[in-house]
């Protein structure tokens, strides 16, 4: 079937470009969604459809925000969180526009795209059939000593700025045709913004450390001779995965462009088998209804509830922290409310929402402002904004359909 070029709208109204190839046999039930490497675009991923050779799947591949034909400054995005939300918007668009349910979708992602997808699997817990991750860029090899620390310092001083990729095509693949197309492709951008590069590290560390929360059937392909990303975080991610169905394949001699390597048929044999097996069986989901009683969640809760000896560094830190909160409550209104009613009380929540620093003196106001700007409270306020937007969106759709709008506030 002929490839089509289309656009979909994200939650913030940005129109992102994507390629769509209908199933060759005319079926409309299943889809494979492709996510490209950093710096690249969908045009360099659609060959995967040809190599897989599945006629009963539709294929979709996007140009991530700031890449290819999609808008935005090249190599940039408002945040990693925005790009992950874009992934969710894309899958939702496929469901609403083409009627393909998430449970009939397989996701294939490479490098930076694999980090976005793994973060999406972790944060959004989508009910997709399976995922294939090829050489996820959980930790990029920065060969300059202290490069990451230096970038953090420079970002605080300069704000967001861009760095160019050092990676040459011959470090990505042994395949001469892929090398030449990489060098000649005008849509490839060498630059990446520092906020995205650093955000990539932070998201990857979070997902790798908490990979047990991911239960999607998953196949991990690791390039054995990767010049671009480290191996250890990929193995840590796999070892911690909560998926009951998971596979790891280490491909000796492969460079970073796993799916575009000279001997990529080795990888595609495993991918074809894995995808067919998943779609030949009913969707399998891990039962987490007892996770609060046993398993990783219970273990983590028990560890957090374990008292810390004051004589240890962590114990001393938190004892000092609690004492500081109590002392600060003499001058800070927010800390006073938290101490008297609890930091998880409705009174505290109302105060955080108002976001107006108050105190008994100028010092107290300064402490209160610092308290209200804590990352947790900023997240709470953003959650309120998101809930409001979700209610507005749902209400608008109901009105368009001529249905009544009823809102129930469960508190």
Residue spans of the language-model regions?
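N-terminal cap/lid segment of alpha/beta-hydrolase-fold proteins
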Residues: 1-23
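Catalytic nucleophile-loop/oxyanion-hole region of alpha/beta-hydrolase
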Residues: 39-42, 68-101
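Conserved alpha/beta-hydrolase
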Residues: 49-73
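Alpha/beta-hydrolase-fold enzymes
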Residues: 110-193, 322-336
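Short beta-strand/loop motif that positions the catalytic acidic residue
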Residues: 214, 220-222, 226
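Short alpha-helix in the alpha/beta-hydrolase fold that links the catalytic acid
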Residues: 216, 230-239
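Catalytic active-site module of serine/aspartate enzymes centered on a nucleophile-bearing elbow/loop
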Residues: 249-301
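Class I SAM-dependent methyltransferase Rossmann-like catalytic core
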Residues: 329-403
């Amino acid at each position: 079937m002929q490839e089509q070029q289309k656009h979909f709208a994200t939650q913030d109204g940005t129109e992102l470009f994507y390629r769509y190839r209908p199933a060759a046999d005319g079926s409309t039930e299943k889809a494979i969604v492709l996510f490209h490497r950093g710096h690249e675009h969908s045009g360099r991923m659609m060959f995967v459809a040809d190599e897989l050779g599945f006629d009963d799947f539709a294929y979709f591949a996007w140009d991530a925000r700031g890449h290819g034909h999609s808008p935005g400054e090249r190599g940039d995005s408002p945040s990693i969180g925005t790009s992950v939300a874009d992934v969710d918007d894309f899958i939702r668009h496929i469901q609403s526009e083409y009627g393909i349910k998430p449970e009939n979708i397989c996701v294939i992602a490479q490098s930076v795209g694999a980090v976005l997808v793994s973060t999406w699997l972790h944060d959004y817990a989508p009910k997709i059939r399976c995922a294939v991750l090829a050489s996820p860029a959980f930790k990029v090899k920065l060969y300059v000593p202290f490069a990451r620390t230096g970038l953090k310092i420079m970002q605080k001083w300069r704000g967001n700025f861009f760095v160019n990729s050092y990676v040459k095509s011959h470090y990505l693949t042994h395949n001469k045709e892929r090398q030449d197309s990489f060098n000649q492709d005008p849509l490839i951008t060498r630059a990446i913004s520092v906020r995205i590069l650093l955000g990539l590290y932070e998201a990857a560390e979070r997902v790798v450390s908490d990979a047990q929360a991911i239960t999607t059937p998953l196949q991990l392909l690791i390039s054995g001779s990767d010049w671009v990303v480290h191996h250890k975080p990929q193995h840590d991610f796999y070892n911690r995965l909560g998926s009951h169905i998971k596979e790891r394949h280490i491909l000796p001699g492969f460079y970073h462009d796993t799916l575009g390597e000279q001997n990529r048929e080795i990888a595609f044999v495993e991918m074809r088998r894995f995808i067919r097996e998943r779609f030949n069986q009913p969707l399998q989901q891990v039962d987490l209804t007892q996770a609060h009683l046993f398993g990783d969640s219970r273990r983590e809760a028990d560890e957090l509830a374990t008292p810390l000896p004051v004589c240890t560094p962590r114990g001393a830190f938190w004892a000092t922290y609690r004492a500081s909160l109590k002392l600060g409550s003499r001058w800070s209104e927010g800390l006073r409310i938290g101490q008297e009613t609890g930091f998880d009380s409705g009174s505290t929540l109302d105060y955080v929402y108002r976001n107006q620093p108050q105190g008994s003196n100028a010092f107290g106001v300064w402490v209160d402002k610092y308290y209200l700007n804590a990352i947790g409270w900023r997240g709470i306020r953003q959650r309120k904004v998101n809930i409001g937007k979700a209610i507005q969106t749902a209400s608008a759709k109901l009105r368009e359909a001529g249905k009544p709008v009823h809102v129930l506030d469960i508190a």
